[in-house]
Structures are given as structure tokens and as C-alpha cells.
């Protein structure tokens, strides 16, 4: 999605809001900031992105699972659209996908990501879980200060270096999902270890 955003702005000259789910990379935010574009964060589920697309002239919307949509297209996650857009990006740039990824990482990365699903033995009360995670919120994780906490969907700790850790119950399965994005693989591992310990305390 980050590659698509850069292409739409720099090659097509598009402007407008960017919408992403809470579990999607913050590289998008850093790139959008360079272009002075607003970013809206939604709960997980493309229906929340679609709500924005139906109300505003959204440039691009997407989620962690790979579903995206762009201005003028249907307000629904479309993997075929993403595939076609990637082909266009590669053709226009003359670069390989690997080189494009390296280039975007040099601009707004690096970013490493991991997700783990913890199987629940009993249902989790979402509000009770959220309150527990807020009450026990750490001052720092893996040596980075927690600078912001989002509760738009689960609880997301955002760190000073723009790394983040998200703990949220799945809306479709009896699992608790733990997500982390960090600047190094070691940072991601440390955040996941912390997140899984905390998540286990509420399962």
C-alpha cells in the first residue's frame, strides 16, 4: 500500500486523504506526512474504510491483509486491483519489486512486522480486556517510551520511534491477535514477547 500511495501521488498527481486500519503499517503515515496528506485510522475491517470512501474523496484505503481500494474504484478491498497497480508501478518505474521495496524502506522505513494469534480457551470480554491493558499500560516497551495509546480497536501502544504493539480480539475467530511493527527485527521480537505475555494474562 505504501508503494501504491507513492505512485498515485508522484506519478498520477493525486491528492486526498489516506485511510488505513489500526493494524496496517505506519510507513503509510510517514509517507503521507511528506506529502501533507491526512491519514485516518480505522478499526480492522474494510467496511470501516468504505465508510470514509463513501463520505470523502479518499485517495487510497487499505488494510493489513492486503485489500486496498483507490479513488474511482469500488469501496471494497480488491486484491486484483493491487496486483494490477503493482504491475503498473513496476512498468512505469522500470525497477524490480525488490528494488522498489528497498527504496521505499530507505525513504520511510525500515519496518519489520509480525502477528501472532493466541487461541482462546474462553471468550474475552472486550471492554474488560481493554481496561486491563490501559490500567497496566507500560511507560516503555523494549527501551522505547510509550508516547500514545489508541483504543480504536483493542489497545495499541505507539512508541517514540514510531514502533507499535497492538493487542485485539479477533472479530471472526476465538483468538486474541498480537501485532508488532518495529525498526529492527530485534525490536519486533521484544515487543511480541511483551505483548504475548500481557495478552496471556487476559485470556
Regions of interest found by a model, annotated:
Residues 10, 14-179, 185-203:
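Phosphate-binding and adjacent anionic-ligand microenvironments
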Residues 1-11:
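Cysteine protease catalytic core and zymogen-processing segment of caspase-like enzymes
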